[in-house]
Regions:
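Intrinsic-disorder/low-complexity, polar/charged segments enriched in Ser/Thr/Lys/Arg/Asp/Glu/Gln
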Residues: 67-69, 128, 202
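Short acidic-hydrophobic catalytic motif
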Residues: 118-121, 126-128, 141, 145-200
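N-terminal, charged/glycine-rich beta-strand/loop interface patches
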Residues: 1-118, 123
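Glycine-rich, often acidic-flanked micro-motifs
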Residues: 205
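Conserved small/polar residues in nucleotide/adenosyl-binding loops
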Residues: 210-213
Length: 213
């Protein structure tokens, strides 16, 4: 796939190609993972052959210096759901950050639901996430990107240093949507009207069907 080049070499990686077989069942024609990212085998709850795949982090969370890449390609006729079994935790960081790149490509006739759980940045963490989603006309993409205030139950609320997430969606190679989120709690009250309006979770759901974002 012709995704943009990464600025750094990842130390954790997932790569999947979803393909539909002759019986109409979607399977992982390619599956690769490198710890600290790990893939579980596909599950099937629906009679239509939709593959449900979970990614997990054996370390329990994401650390400073982590550079994590997820690449998913959904071929024509394939129908897949990609998610995580729990929140994506970003642990406290002393002198560096974590960077995450998510790359999705949906071919015409493919259906991909990319629905990871919430990102939870712990106190003093710095997170940079870059989402690049490419969809051909006739492909279907549902993608979620959500972040919470932190470990609220432990008394942390917006105690992270910086959370930044950039999302670009391309349809047939043309940029259709650019969404940039940059949250720095120390510089402004994120709960004020016009920002989070009192809510402690911020998220976006991107739906691309028949080239309508």
């Amino acid at each position: 796939m012709l995704w943009d080049a990464l600025t750094e070499k990842p130390n954790g990686e997932i790569s999947i190609v979803f393909r539909r077989n002759a019986e109409g069942k979607t399977y992982m024609a390619r599956q690769y993972h490198k710890i600290p990212l790990q893939l579980l085998k596909a599950h099937y709850y629906d009679v239509d052959g939709t593959a449900i795949v979970y990614s997990l982090n054996p370390a329990g969370g994401i650390l400073q210096h982590d550079r994590l890449l997820t690449e998913i390609e959904c071929e024509a006729g394939a129908d897949a759901i990609f998610t995580t079994p729990g929140n994506n935790k970003y642990y406290r960081m002393d002198d560096d950050c974590a960077k995450v790149w998510n790359r999705l490509y949906v071919h015409s006739g493919g259906i991909l639901e990319y629905l990871p759980e919430h990102n939870v940045p712990f106190a003093d963490s710095t997170v940079y996430q870059d989402n690049e989603f490419r969809v051909e006309k006739g492909g279907v993409l549902f993608a979620a990107d959500m972040v919470t205030a932190g470990r609220v139950a432990s008394g942390e609320r917006f105690d992270y240093t910086h959370y930044a997430s950039r999302t670009r969606i391309f349809i047939d190679g043309e940029l259709a949507l650019y969404d940039n989120c940059s949250l720095k709690p120390s510089e402004e009250d994120l709960l004020q009207t016009g920002l989070l309006d009192g809510y402690q979770t911020n998220g976006s759901l991107y739906v691309d069907r028949k080239s309508v974002v």
